[in-house]
Every structure is written in C-alpha cells, then in structure tokens.
Amino acid sequence: VSTWLEKCGFPTPIKDASEPTVLSYPGVLAHSLAHLIMTRLSYECGYSLPSICDRIYDLPDGRQAFLVYTAESDIMGTLGGLVDFGDGPKLEELVKGALQDAIWCSQDPVCIGRVVDAAFKQAACCHKCLYLPETSCEWMNTHLDRATIVGNKDRSVKGINTK
C-alpha cells in the first residue's frame, strides 16, 4: 500500500515501523507547531483536545508538513469547524494566535531552559505548553521543542517566531 501511495504522489508519514522513530529537526518544528495549532483550535472551535489528532509528513521534496484532523465519529468529530478555520484569514489568525501562545509557558524558565536529550525526544516542552492527550499525538508527546518556535532563554537558538 505504501508503495502505491508513493507512486500516486501521496506524502509518506515520517513515522514508519521499519524506520527509527526519530524526527528530523524540521520535523520537530512541524510537530511543535501542530500541537500549538491543535491547542488553539480547541479554544477557537470548541473541540475537546482528545478529539483532535495530528500526523507529521515528510514530503518528497524534503519539506515537512502536518495534518490536523478529528478522530471522533460523533457530532464532535464532524469536520465543519476545522474546515472553516482552514480558509484564508481565519487560518492566518489561528496560526498567529498559536505562535503568540508559544511565547510564554507558566513553567518558564524551567520549561524553555531544558536541554535537548541525545535522541531528541524531549526538549523545551511540558504539560502546560505543548503536551496533548497521548491519544491525540501520533508521537506520544515526544519530539517536541518550543524553542524551535520562540528560541531559547539564552538566545543561542532562534525560533521561527523570534525577532
């Protein structure tokens, strides 16, 4: 099936049972941004966090992407609210809000000061800023780093939302 999907031009998920379970640094950035957007969607759309899931993709041209979707089959799982936020100005406001949310964590400076471990499974992340219910996260809340978004406390790393 995966060969057929690849031939048809579908992006392949980064996580593959036959591959090591480690994301690249751009994948960690995409994963962290996905979690911020999912949390913001929960506030904006009224979806519960356990009903929103993510999927991280490695595109053939080397770029990273993520998919945010609902996993519920009841009324909470309809795509109407998510589809509405995927269009133009609403999407822009959603992303801006998510990036704004990343600036501060109630566990700082401890959270943002964490050093990346050798397997890059844990870095600047915690239950207050990036962790989601584990049923929502394909990677079980590993490979997350808020510093990829806002930079770190000693400014040795610049995030995408750093001025």
What residues fall within each predicted segment?
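C-terminal accessory domains/tails appended to large, multi-domain proteins
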Residues: V1-K163
